[in-house]
């Protein structure tokens, strides 16, 4: 016999309604958190949103000891530094960052650098 499962949640975030945070220098940009467990009940916790860094800004090197992260660049160009190695960050670049891996993002162009991110769990 097949197991019966209760339906999961549905939740919609319209443009301009995500939780938004200003990031001070050196990023000097903003991050939007569209989905996370504080907003909707999830069987498999995750967080999803966007980040924008203006020309000359960067996200400081950091790591997540309990989370994996996916980054997908949707506008602009810059660089990602993954465990000390530079990689181009341009439209369509997808990056997977495993737990405890150092990473940072640098906008060394003349336009905003914009990406979508997903963090699990």
What feature does the model see in each segment?
Residues 51, 96, 110-121:
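A short hydrophobic beta-strand segment most commonly corresponding to one strand
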Residues 84-99:
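Short acidic-glycine-tyrosine-enriched beta hairpin
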Residues 55, 66, 85, 101-102, ...:
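A generic "binding-loop/recognition-motif" signal
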Residues 75, 83, 120:
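Cofactor-binding loop segments of dinucleotide-utilizing enzymes, especially the Rossmann-like FAD-
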Residues 1-46, 60:
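A short, N-terminal "cap"/entry segment at the start of jelly-roll beta-barrel domains
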Residues 45, 50-54, 63-80:
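Short, conserved beta-strand element in jelly-roll/cupin
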Residues 31-37, 49-65, 99:
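Conserved short histidine dyad/triad with adjacent acidic residue
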Residues 60-62, 80-81, 97, 103-109:
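Short beta-strand His + acidic residue motifs that chelate non-heme Fe in jelly-roll/DSBH
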């Amino acid at each position: 016999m097949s197991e019966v499962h209760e339906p999961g949640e549905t939740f919609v975030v319209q443009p301009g309604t995500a939780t938004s945070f200003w990031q001070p220098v050196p990023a000097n940009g903003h991050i939007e958190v569209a989905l996370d467990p504080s907003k909707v009940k999830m069987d498999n916790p995750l967080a999803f949103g966007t980040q924008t860094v203006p020309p000359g800004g960067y996200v400081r090197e950091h790591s997540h000891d309990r989370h994996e992260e996916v980054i997908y660049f949707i506008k602009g160009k810059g660089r990602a530094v993954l465990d000390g190695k530079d990689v181009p960050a341009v439209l369509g670049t997808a990056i997977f960052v495993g737990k405890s891996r150092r990473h940072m993002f640098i906008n060394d162009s003349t336009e905003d650098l914009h990406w979508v991110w997903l963090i699990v769990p």
